[in-house]
Amino acid sequence: MSAVLDTPVAIRRTAMDLLARREHGRVELTRKLRQRGASDELIEPELDRLAEEGLLSEARYLESFIRYRSGSGYGPARIREELCQRGLARADIDQALRESEVNWGERMRDVWQRKFAGQRPQDPRSRAQQTRFLAYRGFPMDMIGRLLSGRDLDDY
């Protein structure tokens, strides 16, 4: 049985419990607190306080999410879309992707190697299959084209 979130202390405690497990964005944390029965009038001041204290940070959330999803084999376009769906500002997402230390060319090559054992496409059908797979994973088409034609990816 879950506790009723009808006081600022209960909301803060629940928010801190959620943040202790992993980073959350403000929108996501608000949604989770609402699902647990908290009202918006009580949520907003507590989240403001957590942000002032440095316990709630969109920048840390973005960094953590990008690191996790890129490590799972997803490219920048897919990650950008997922973060937009989670209610984060496009400008913040783009900045975090630029500042991330992910080598997207290397990441794409690793994903491609695992899936296709490094076999370059021999016919249009297999090229289309490999292109679709990498595009679905969120890698840019120009990078995919360079990889599948055997050109250098070092500038990514």
UniProtKB/Swiss-Prot annotation:
Q: Is Cytoplasm one of the keywords UniProt gives this record?
A: yes
| UniProt-listed PANTHER family | REGULATORY PROTEIN RECX FAMILY PROTEIN (PTHR33602:SF1)
Q: Which HAMAP family match?
A: RecX
Q: Does the keyword GTP-binding apply?
A: no
- Taxonomically, which superkingdom? Bacteria
Question: What does the record list as GO biological process?
Answer: regulation of DNA repair
Q: List the subcellular locations.
A: Cytoplasm
According to UniProt, the name of this protein is: Regulatory protein RecX
GO cellular component terms, A-Z: cytoplasm
Checking InterPro entries in the record gives: RecX_HTH_1st, RecX_HTH_2nd, RecX_HTH_3rd, Regulatory_RecX, WH-like_DNA-bd_sf
Q: What is the lineage of its organism?
A: Bacteria, Pseudomonadati, Pseudomonadota, Gammaproteobacteria, Pseudomonadales
Q: Which gene encodes it?
A: recX
Its job: Modulates RecA activity.
Similarity section: Belongs to the RecX family.
What are the entry keywords? Cytoplasm
Q: What Pfam families does the annotation carry?
A: RecX_HTH1 (PF21982), RecX_HTH2 (PF02631), RecX_HTH3 (PF21981)
Task: Using the UniProt record, give the first listed, main subcellular location.
Answer: cytoplasm
Q: Which NCBIfam families match?
A: PRK00117.2-1
